[in-house]
UniProtKB/Swiss-Prot annotation:
Assigned EC number: 3.1.11.-, 3.1.13.-
Designated name of the protein: 3'-5' ssDNA/RNA exonuclease TatD
Binding site for a divalent metal cation: 92, 128, 153
InterPro entries cross-referenced by the UniProt entry: DNase_TatD-rel_CS (IPR018228), Exonuc_TatD (IPR024918), Metal_Hydrolase (IPR032466), TatD-like (IPR001130), TatD-type_Hydrolase (IPR050891)
GN (gene name): tatD
Length: 263
C-alpha cells in the first residue's frame, strides 16, 4: 500500500521522525509521498525524501493558505526543487475558500502559476480544494490536457464535486475522514462511485486520526502506520478485498507519480 499524503515536515514529528518512517515500513507500506505546502516545507520535504530513497518521495508547492507568499522568488525555488528526481508532483496547490487565510485572488494567482509550472515540467499536480469546487474546476480544466494527471488530495466534498472531478479525469485521495461517524458518512456512501483505478489512500498525518480505530495513541497523533486501518475500512465500505485494494491503490499512485513498480 502507498501513502500519498504525509505531512512529515510537521513539528509534531520532530521527536521521532525516523521511527515514524520505520513504523510505516513495518506496517507494510511500500512507499510514501511527503507533502510540500510552502517554499520552506517543500525544501524540507525533499531532504526527508532523500533520506529514504525508494521509499519516500515529495511534492513541491504552495498550499492556498500560504498563497499570499507566492512571488517570483518562491516560484524559482519551487522550480529548482521540482527538477530533482525524488520530487514527483507540484503541490499541494489549489483553492481553500473555507478559511481564506490568503485572499481569493492571491490563491487563484498562485494556483494558476503552479499549474503553469506543472505543465512546463510535465509533472502531475497534488491538489487541495475546500469550499471552492466550481471555481477550482474552472481554473484547472484548461490545463488538464497538458498535464500528466492530478489527484484531489483529502477529498471531503459533495457528490456533485466528486462527479465533476472524475469527469475531468482526476484521481481521488481518501483519508481517515471517512472513518468519522460525525462528518464522514456522506463521503462513506460515495466511496463506491470512485472507479478503482482512480482511487488513492492517505492518512494526511499528523492530522485526521481515524476515529473508529482501536487502541488510538494517547497523543491523538495520526501517522502512516495507521494506513492499513483506512485501507481495511474503505475496502469494507466498497465491498472489496483489502489486499486487492491495497495493491491497486499502490499501483495507481505509482502510475500517477511515475514511480517504479512495487517490489
Amino acid at each position: 500500500m502507498f501513502e500519498i499524503g504525509i505531512n512529515l515536515t510537521s513539528s509534531q514529528f520532530d521527536k521521532d521522525r525516523l521511527q515514524v518512517v520505520e513504523r510505516a515500513r513495518t506496517a507494510g507500506l511500500s512507499g510514501m509521498l511527503i507533502t510540500g505546502t510552502s517554499a520552506q516545507e517543500s525544501v524540507e520535504a525533499q531532504k526527508m525524501a532523500d533520506e529514504h530513497p525508494d521509499f519516500c518521495w515529495s511534492t513541491a508547492g504552495v498550499h492556498p493558505h500560504q498563497a499570499s507568499h507566492w512571488n517570483a522568488q518562491v516560484e524559482a525555488g519551487i522550480r529548482e526543487l521540482a527538477v530533482l528526481p525524488n520530487v514527483v508532483a507540484i503541490g499541494e496547490c489549489g483553492l481553500d475558500f473555507n478559511r481564506n487565510f490568503s485572499p481569493a485572488d492571491r490563491q487563484e494567482a498562485a494556483f494558476t502559476a503552479q499549474l503553469a509550472l506543472a505543465k512546463e515540467l510535465q509533472l502531475p499536480v497534488f491538489l487541495h480544494c475546500r469550499d471552492a469546487g466550481e471555481r477550482f474546476a474552472t481554473l484547472l480544466k484548461p490545463w488538464l490536457s497538458d498535464l500528466p494527471g492530478g489527484v484531489v488530495h483529502c477529498f471531503t466534498g459533495t457528490r456533485q464535486e466528486l462527479e465533476l472531478y472524475l469527469s475531468l479525469g482526476l484521481s481521488i485521495g481518501i483519508t481517515g475522514w471517512v472513518c468519522d461517524e460525525r462528518r464522514g458518512l456522506e463521503l462513506r456512501d460515495m466511496l463506491p462511485l470512485i472507479p478503482a483505478d482512480r482511487l488513492m489512500l492517505e492518512t494526511d498525518a499528523p492530522y485526521l486520526l481515524p476515529r473508529d480505530m482501536e487502541n488510538k495513541p494517547k497523543n491523538r497523533r495520526n501517522e502512516p502506520a495507521f494506513l492499513p486501518h483506512i485501507v481495511k475500512q474503505v475496502a469494507l465500505w466498497r465491498g472489496e478485498d483489502p489486499q486487492w485494494l491495497a495493491d491497486i491503490t499502490d499501483d495507481n499512485a505509482r502510475k500517477l507519480f511515475a514511480l517504479s513498480a512495487r517490489r
